[in-house]
Every structure is written in C-alpha cells, then in structure tokens.
Amino acid sequence: MAVVIGRTSEFFDFFVYGTASVLVFPNLLFPEIDRLTATLYSFALFSLAFLARPVGSVIFMEIGRKLGRGVKLTIALFLLGISTAAISFLPGYNQIGYAAVYLLAACRIGQGLALAGAWDGLASLLALSAPDEKRGWYAMMPQLGAPFGFLLASGLFAFFVSALSTADFLDWGWRYPFFVAFAVNVVALFARLRLVMTEQFSELLDQRELRPTSVFEMIRAEGGKVIIGAFAPLATFALFHLVTIFPLSWVTLFSTQSPGEFLVTEMVGASIMIVTVIASGAIADKIGRRTLLGIAAGLIAAFSFVAPLLLAGGVGGQTGFIMLGFGLLGLAFGQSSGAVASKFSGKYRYTGSALTSDLAWLVGAGFAPLVVLGLSSSFGIAAVGAYLLSGAACTLASLTFSRQLETVE
C-alpha cells in the first residue's frame, strides 16, 4: 500500500503540472504570442524536469550513501512539495514579465531533481522479492500509481475548468490542484518513511543488494546495460505522454471539444488503464515479461498507424484514441519497471535501475509533447504515428539485444 500511495503522489504531481502546461501556463506566461507557440514554449518548460532527473540521481545517490535512505527520501519529497507549492503562488507575465518564466523553470527543475531523489527501490524490491510465479504481479503494483494519479489530477482540473469562468480559472482556480499536490506529498512522505525506516525493509534491501553505489562507478562497470535498459520501455514511454498530455493540447488547439469534457474522457481511459495494468501482472506471470513487452511494443506499432486517423476523426475518433491508447499503455506500462532491475548485477542494481528509469523517461517521454505538437502542427497529425512507431522499433531492438530479461518465470 505504501508503494502505491507513494507512486500515486508522484504521478499526481506529474499530471497536475502536465495538465497546467496545456490549460494554464500558455495564457499565464505567454499571453502576447499565439496559443500554439505559447503551448510549445510551455512544453519546453515541461521537459526541464526530465533533463534534471539524471542529475538528481547523481546528487541523491551520494546523499543516500552518506546520510541514509530516510534522509534522502525526506529531502527529496520536501523539495518536491516545496517546488509544487511554489508554483501555486506563481505570478504571471502581466505581473512580473518574463521573470515568471524563470521562476517556473526553477520550480520545474526542482521537481525533476526531487523525483530522482524519491527513488527508494520499492518497485525493484517488490519485483525481486516476489515468488517466481508472481513476479509480474508484484512488479505491476507500483505502476498503478500512474492511472490513480492521473484520475486525481484530471478530476480536479475538470471540476475547476467546468465550474469556473475562464477568467476565474486562469486567475486562481488552477492553483488549487497544486495546493492539493503539496498536501498529498506530506501524506505520502510519512507513509513511505514508516516503511523505509523499518528494520525489516532495510534487511530486505540488503538481502537483495539494493544499496546505492556511485553512479560513475556503476556506469564504468555496467553502462551498456543502462543504455539497453533505457530503450527497453521506450514504446511505453512514447505512448505515455501521447495519450495523457499531448491529446489535451491537440483538442484544446484544434478541436471544438471543451477541455473539461475531454478530461472526463481521459479519466475513463485512465480507468481502463487500471484494469490493463492489473492484467499485465497476470499475463507476465504466464508468458514472461520479455514476451509481454515485445507483444505490447508490436501492438503499439500497429496502433501508430491508426492513431492519426482517430485523432483527426472528430469527437468519436478522439474518444477511441483515448480508450485504445490507455488500454495499451496499461498493458505495457504495468511491466516497464519490473524489467529493469533484473538486468543489473546485485551490486549495481539499485543505482542502475534508478538511472535507467531516468534516461528512459528523458528519451521516451520528456520531449514527446513538444516534439509531436511541433511536428503535427507543421507537417500534419501523422507525426503522432511516426513518433509511436519509432518508440516501438527502439523497444523491439532493445529486447532483441538483451538476453537477461527472463522469458518465462
């Protein structure tokens, strides 16, 4: 339960900011330029957290080695909470000009550093400590934080967008989800500390050799595994933002649907994702994680050919895109973290898993909304399919070269 609560709080923060990147920051920070360009600038700020995450891993791994897991996690979650709460008080361009952009950039970098520091090894521990016949099931559990966090964030924004006038929403309504995010972080901090600081948890980490090591030492010893591991879930992470953040921007800019209505549609999609994340655990225990990731990548590749047609197909097509996209995402995302830890030797498993996750998010998801919106607005909606297809190809290539993911547990 602590794992799910902790991951839900992280993803709630993640999606609160992502949704605001579409509905709030283009108007708040760039009111004097056209909406499309303003959204692209907003997505550029969005990507800063992903650039900061590998740096955060280097910093917080050292803190963990020298001061302990509890201190590391406390600093990380306080930084995450402070960065998120500070955004809720952010003045706009009309108050302080482009200084508001720099303030938001600083907060976003703080979020990225903190998310890297919040890596506690719980997901890896679950996957490695589970019975052989249940490893896929246990690896799936932390991944439920993504759809739960999305449901909470989208529900809040859907309420405020629908209940308030545009002026009131842009003035003060958008700030409340960030206040809630801070409160959720406080609850998550104490829930995770109660687990992380127990002797039983420390003993389990030691038994599985999940201890922080120097990032640079790990890269020298097993850097190749980091590269392979970062590409293994690329199809998943490419799809991640193309069904959560990007469609909201596309609908807001180029469709007649209201943001509130579309957020409700995405919430239904997230509910489907919960089901398919759970299903991924059962399926992985039957056929193996490597096989499931390969099948999911193949399905995402097939989806890439119909995704542009659905997005261009009006309300019905866009609804179909969301339902199919979230369903596929759950199937792939459910095992994307469980596959990483098994690639590293015991000594480097903790640090290697953290850095691999950071790089996978950076390459696959960090720039996805920016790149796809920019390409789609210039060359057509087919760019969505091309981006998804490239991610699927990278995943299949990585799985071909990797031989350490088990085929059948």
Segments predicted by a language model, with ranges:
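Multi-pass alpha-helical transporter architecture, strongest
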Residues: A188-L195, L389-E409
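Extracytoplasmic gate region of multi-pass secondary transporters
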Residues: G18, G223-I272, A365
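Glycine-rich segments within core transmembrane alpha-helices of 12-TM secondary carriers
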Residues: W137-V161, V184, T356-A368
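C-terminal ends and interior cores of transmembrane alpha-helices
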Residues: F78-I96, G298-G313
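Helix-loop-helix hairpin linking two adjacent transmembrane segments in secondary transporters
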Residues: A146-R192
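Cytoplasmic membrane-interface "Motif A"-like loop-to-helix N-cap segments
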Residues: K66-F78, K286-A297
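Hydrophobic core of transmembrane alpha-helices in multi-pass small-molecule transporters
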Residues: G97-A116, G317-L331
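Helix-to-loop junctions at the C-terminal end of transmembrane segments
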Residues: V55-R69, V277-R289
